[in-house]
Amino acid sequence: MSNQRVLYWPETYNNIKELGRGVSGVVYKASHKKTGQIVAIKLVDMKQSKISTEQIQGEIRALLTLNPENERTHINIIKLIQCFIHKTTAIFILEYVDGGTLEDFMYSFERGMPLSLISHCLYQSVNAIEYMNSKKCSHRDIKPANILMLRNRKPKLKQQSEQQQQEDGGYIRYSGQFQLEPSSQENNNYQFDPDELPILKVTDYGYASISGNDSAEIHSTLAGSPLYMAPEIIHIILSPFLEPGTGKLSADSSEGYNPLLVDVWAIGAVAFRLITGDDLISVIFPNLNQTTVLAALVNLAKMIDNGDFQKGLDSIPNEIRKYGLVDPDIELGISFITSLLQLDPKKRLPLKETLNHPFLAKGKLSFTQTLNQHYKDNKDVLGSIVPSDISNFLNQNQQQQQQQQKSFSTSSLPQVNHNNDTNNNNNNNNNNNNNNNNNNNNNNNNNNNNEKDKDNQSNNSSSSSSSSSPPSPTISKSSPSSLSSSLSPSSSTDDLPKAMKWSSSVKPPKKSNFAPTFLSHQRSDKITLFPKLLPPPTKDAPPLETMNWRSPPVEVGDSITWTTLTQDAIFQVQFSVLTSFLKVISASNSYQFRIITSLTKVPLEIAVSNHKDTILYMYNIVKSVIAPQLISLSNAFDENSIRSVLAAILYQIGTETEQAEIANCWTLV
């Protein structure tokens, strides 16, 4: 199977240059062949991408919600011009934002930004998030790298010949007299000018969530970047590591979090970094074990329980004052930050009130002045185009769920409740392994969502940058007239013999005396009747003799369980760990892969195989019925053998330089 990424390019656009890339896709600067309009085109390979179909659906749904057809788009929200599906490529035509990211801009200051400039930037960011929340949309990954800036609008002009192109206001004109003179920086990023403050755009909606009713839905899936992640997410997702009987931030809190409130926390964390130049967590918890992301987050979760986290939050005012900032508005800035960084989500200042906070008063004034002086004639009112294939794609999971519910309506399987991360009641497991059966050996495992590649300064609106670049994609030109929204693996059984059925085994695995450890916090009643609940094998199924289903499922008794991206709270967002495991282990048949459900109070093993391709195929079959699932790896269920496996994996990571830095000292090994 080829590891080469194949992406289809829309024929109506000229490819100017690549802006940035990540494991989820590539972003290009392009121009429309007829109009010359400059755009950013994001291409996502749905066949090999490390993100799930649900995540792509969520991003499309969020962009469509925030870019209503034939209506003016909010100035601080990235504009969606068009989106469609062609074969295995999701294509996003987005507004081209040319001034780099707020993350890049921060580094032009030695230590923190001027408070008036911070107020200007935060007012726009809060304005955008408040608008999103009014649409029942939460971003869930607010950070400086996901906030873009328009570059300066008043550069010097210089003469140019008629043969040269003119780039002005987002268009290429093929006959003209003048050309905008590039700034001193080669990339034309926004450069600080007190007479022309920047316009910001919130982007990257890969983890966005849409609530389907008037009341905010409760979520329990991990989303966001560790340095800006709200404590309720850390605490709830990692609750299995904590002592029994704990796991709630307040007496009336439920087992989940309100996604509309996590954005408020993120804004506070961003404000802290803009003022001090340092990350919140590193400052208020200087002794935190940050050897790995997992270790750091588990320790933070424990600190929430024992009260140390609250002590860290209480230290914020004094920590900010230690920077010796000489500005009369510094106390207003401290008040602004502490009103947002509240441990109890319900005590955080609502966004509507945040917009009226005294610290943002100067920002509101400067933002209004900037619009009047430099964007008064901006008449970009293009509406988003929504082809029918996108509507079909967004409804795909809902239709599948309805069919499954109809098929299993007479089953004795207990009801399992799922939280809705999208408007169409999608399961909240965020199955990042949805396409792994087509990408088992993909080497693009540096999925760092917290550190944007500096090449993404113009418009990395979609993907976290990789710490090492994936292989260049093959761009196939194709006409949008032959669009297709088929995303899922083939499930047709027309060519299969009618007698083809799953085989099963009741042989239990060997148990140990150690208690199992799982990252999933979700528990419910027993699950039985496998594999009767499963759809029949498809024509592309691996040999049935390589599959072994447990019927009924058996309890898992060994203590070490390696999880996939699907339910692993850390790796789901940041790292493609499963592929690294498979690359090392696949050469040996002595290791057994297991599919485990953590929906039950006692984890159950429901399938095993010694073949990596088979286990991934079985995994994609299982997740259509029950989620979330885990894939475990062991050798004859001997815990000691795992150590040699781990050593091999660490060696592999070291030789391939796959170690990923997540910010100041956040490292995964």
UniProtKB/Swiss-Prot annotation:
Broad class of enzyme this protein falls into: transferase
GO CC, alphabetical: cytoplasm
Record: residues binding ATP: 19-27, 42
GO biological process, one term: regulation of autophagy
InterPro entries: Atg1-like (IPR045269), Kinase-like_dom_sf (IPR011009), Prot_kinase_dom (IPR000719), Protein_kinase_ATP_BS (IPR017441), Ser/Thr_kinase_AS (IPR008271)
Keyword tags: ATP-binding, Kinase, Nucleotide-binding, Serine/threonine-protein kinase, Transferase
Superkingdom: Eukaryota
Catalytic activity: L-seryl-[protein] + ATP = O-phospho-L-seryl-[protein] + ADP + H(+); L-threonyl-[protein] + ATP = O-phospho-L-threonyl-[protein] + ADP + H(+)
Comp. bias regions, Low complexity: 396-405, 419-449, 457-494
Pfam family, one: Pkinase
Annotated EC: 2.7.11.1
Gene Ontology MF annotations: ATP binding; protein serine kinase activity; protein serine/threonine kinase activity
Region (Disordered): 396-518, 530-550
Protein's UniProt keywords contain Amino-acid biosynthesis: no
Bias (Polar residues): 406-418
Record domain Protein kinase: where: 13-360
Keyword ATP-binding found: yes
UniProt similarity note: Belongs to the protein kinase superfamily. Ser/Thr protein kinase family.
PANTHER family to which the protein is assigned, alphabetical: SERINE/THREONINE-PROTEIN KINASE UNC-51-RELATED (PTHR24348), SERINE_THREONINE-PROTEIN KINASE ATG1C (PTHR24348:SF68)
Protein name: Probable serine/threonine-protein kinase DDB_G0291918
Organism: Dictyostelium discoideum (Social amoeba)
